[in-house]
Amino acid sequence: MSKLRQIAFYGKGGIGKSTTSQNTLAALVEMGQKILIVGCDPKADSTRLILNAKAQDTVLSLAAEAGSVEDLELEDVLKIGYKGIKCVESGGPEPGVGCAGRGVITSINFLEENGAYDDVDYVSYDVLGDVVCGGFAMPIRENKAQEIYIVMSGEMMALYAANNIAKGILKYAHSGGVRLGGLICNERQTDREYDLADALAKRLNSKLVHFVPRANIVQHAELRKQTVIEYAPDSAQAGEYRTLAQKIHANSGQGTVPTPITMEELEDMLLEFGIMKTDEQALAELAAKEAKAAAALA
């Protein structure tokens, strides 16, 4: 059996990280790979499309019902989805109470101790990336995830989050084996999006693994709680996810130690690509607008 690959998808909330990861993993399982998904997002939506169901019960909620994690069996928390993909959601506490990352730590330890990682080719962690706090950084910090894929777009906050995640990877890259596998751009149809994503990837000493075009069929599939791979296997969008899966499969050992940039450098990049206006441009536009309004009144 091939060496276990532990990958993680990180990204800003709402970027389409869980959708992208589940479609990619559905394509990987079609390639004959055995997969375990460990959802590390408090929304617990990392496995919904694979299971064709509402969010599955989380390790933390089941442990609370049973008394403790020690009272659980592996089959209590592990569900089997599309083409045999194993699914677990770590979960998080009630909003405003406790550390959401605690569920990640508890879950990974429980899964390892109970043999969930046996007989799989890939373990995939789906992780919230707005905050790289101790708990959410756990797959990186504890040397679990070896390849990190950052899902982003051409929007400023997605770029900012991607750079922050790169900082988190760098922090643990030298003490462990974690590497940045690359960036995955989920198209939002912003100006010069591909160029900007590609430029950021290069600045981070990485690469743009794939540019996933925006397509309504993704939402159609999601409404039916399915991946595009399952819902419309012959569609162009399913082909995009298969291409992404092939690229990730071929990317073993290709990860890099990232070189995060400063906020000033990020803003300079946005100015360079015309995404952010300089003060001079903004003032010139305002003056032109006022002149036009004055002419209309004259």
From Swiss-Prot:
Cofactor, free-text remark: Binds 1 [4Fe-4S] cluster per dimer.
InterPro entries: NifH/chlL_CS, NifH/frxC, Nitrogenase_Fe_NifH, P-loop_NTPase
Cofactors: [4Fe-4S] cluster
Cross-referenced Gene3D superfamilies: P-loop containing nucleotide triphosphate hydrolases (3.40.50.300)
EC category: oxidoreductase
SUPFAM superfamilies: P-loop containing nucleoside triphosphate hydrolases
Domain of life (superkingdom): Bacteria
Catalytic activity entry: N2 + 8 reduced [2Fe-2S]-[ferredoxin] + 16 ATP + 16 H2O = H2 + 8 oxidized [2Fe-2S]-[ferredoxin] + 2 NH4(+) + 16 ADP + 16 phosphate + 6 H(+)
Assembly and oligomerization: Homodimer.
Record-linked PANTHER family: LIGHT-INDEPENDENT PROTOCHLOROPHYLLIDE REDUCTASE IRON-SULFUR ATP-BINDING PROTEIN (PTHR42864:SF2)
Protein's job: The key enzymatic reactions in nitrogen fixation are catalyzed by the nitrogenase complex, which has 2 components: the iron protein and the molybdenum-iron protein.
Family: Belongs to the NifH/BchL/ChlL family.
Protein's recorded name: Nitrogenase iron protein
Lineage: Bacteria, Pseudomonadati, Pseudomonadota, Alphaproteobacteria, Acetobacterales
